[in-house]
């Protein structure tokens, strides 16, 4: 079977898990009730998933990078438990005003993933709850799904008629249902 998407890129906070601010330990990470049901709906559309996330809490001193790595390991284990192929989690710890080309809305993490896993980004989709998730996707020729969970409702006004996501949904589960149609 040919996959619709070579890879599905996911934002983390506000997209697959609640976004209470800065998540500094595994116990603070709460997946939405529908997250894995949604990802299982998406599984037939792709070979794999990659998470792309800004994590400036490290640079702000709110979380140690070792704790972030523990959180990432926990996320990997949850994907594995649900028979979902999570290739990698890319994160950028840069502060918003002092960022490299890796912090979203820049494309660095996407380009690194593309290079490391030989992924054609134009055959991928990015799913996120922030304008910053959709900007690099559009700039790289990726499809996009904007979810209104997390920061989505707050960021929705930032899109205009010339620059908008390919799909908009209330949350990841409803977006997944739309994508599998």
Label for each model-derived stretch:
Residues 1-50:
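Active-site neighborhood of HAD-like aspartate-dependent phosphohydrolases
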Residues 35, 39-72, 86-98, 137:
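Substrate-recognition element of Asp-dependent hydrolases with the DxDx(T/V) motif
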Residues 101-134:
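Conserved Lys-Pro-Asp/Glu-containing loop-to-beta segment of HAD-superfamily phosphomonoesterases
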Residues 166-171, 175:
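Short acidic-hydrophobic, aromatic-tinged amphipathic segments that line or gate anion-handling sites
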